[in-house]
Curated annotation (Swiss-Prot):
Source species, domain of life: Bacteria
Name by which UniProt lists this protein: Aspartate carbamoyltransferase catalytic subunit
Assembly and binders: Heterododecamer (2C3:3R2) of six catalytic PyrB chains organized as two trimers (C3), and six regulatory PyrI chains organized as three dimers (R2).
Gene3D superfamilies per record: Aspartate/ornithine carbamoyltransferase
GO cellular component annotations of the record: cytosol
Residues holding L-aspartate: K84, R169, R221
């Protein structure tokens, strides 16, 4: 393990990480991106349990595990005893008893991991791949890595996060750590989808008020599956009022970058032809997801080896 890396027992929330730990994970992710290798001779076992749909998080964790030479124990929710009524706790208790070292979990219940990491019987380490509208630490870390690669710092950067704020675990993870890192935060999007908790971290604005001032413009997916009622906006109205149109893109500073955690509703949050525009770092975010997740896995496994 790199001497610059600091071990963690679990990675479940950005609130639990220190700035020092965050920076070490970012820098280790960059080292992996630049070719650093870490073969494991003792073949640690990792199981990925996704109770919500996922492409980027699920598959990039798998690629990270392959690159690290870890043993993957596939877990298919559809064919597991979950369908017989088994609880998440008993599922993880079973995998822990079988000798699984790390479980990467995405689950619709906010804070699902609290019961697991508090258990004296469960010895497997937990990496949170997203808990409902709660936290998404690995996405936040890959976003931070992407910003750090671009600017080399966070202090005094103006970052706007726009879209479905209340339902976004990405927004909540990023706002907490970006403020601690010294960035200035702005929040845009429909008033119906932003709660007062965001006011503790930044300023509410309209996208047109801030678009030409920001260094980082981060859009969020409209999460239809987390809304209780029907659509408040048509796709066309949402895009016109809150999305990235060509006119808004043209107003971005020359050095500004465009981000989105994906999946993207094209022509809703971002105009289709702008998803891969020169200022876009969306593909880079996906690439960086592999390397920062390698750093997370390395750190968690190092903690286990130290205990």
């Amino acid at each position: 393990m790199s001497e610059n890396q600091q071990a963690l027992n679990h990675v479940v929330s950005m609130e639990d990480l220190t700035v020092d730990q965050v920076m070490k994970l970012i820098k280790r992710g960059i080292e992996f991106k630049n070719g650093a290798q870490l073969p494991y001779e003792d073949h640690p076992i990792v199981s990925n349990l996704f109770f919500e749909d996922s492409t980027r998080t699920h598959k990039s964790f798998e690629v990270a595990e392959i690159k690290l030479g870890l043993e993957r124990l596939d877990f298919d929710v559809k064919t597991s005893s979950v369908n017989k009524g088994e609880t998440l706790y008993d599922t993880i208790l079973t995998l822990s008893a079988l000798g699984v070292d790390v479980c990467v979990i995405r689950h619709p219940e906010v804070d699902y991991y609290r019961e697991l990491i508090a258990s004296p019987t469960i010895t497997t380490s937990i990496i949170n791949g997203g808990d409902g509208s709660g936290q998404h630490p690995s996405q936040s870390l890959l976003d931070l890595m992407t910003i750090y690669e671009e600017f080399g710092h966070f202090e005094d950067l103006k970052v706007a996060i726009a879209g479905d704020l209340d339902h976004s675990r990405v927004a909540k993870s990023n706002m907490q750590i970006l403020k601690r890192l010294g960035a200035e935060l702005f929040f845009a999007g429909p008033e119906e989808w932003r709660s007062q908790e965001f006011a503790d971290y930044g300023k509410f604005v309209t996208i047109d008020e801030i678009i030409d001032q920001v260094d980082v413009m981060m859009f969020l997916r409209v999460q239809h599956e987390r809304h209780d009622s029907g659509a408040v906006f048509s796709k066309e109205d949402y895009h016109a009022q809150h999305g990235l149109t060509q006119e808004r893109y043209d107003r971005l500073k020359e050095t500004a970058i465009l981000m989105h955690p994906a999946p993207i509703n094209r022509d809703v949050e971002i105009a289709d032809h702008l998803v891969e525009a020169p200022k876009s770092r969306i593909v880079q975010q996906m690439t960086n997801g592999v390397f920062v997740r390698m750093a997370i896995l390395e750190s968690v496994l190092a903690s286990r080896n130290a205990n």
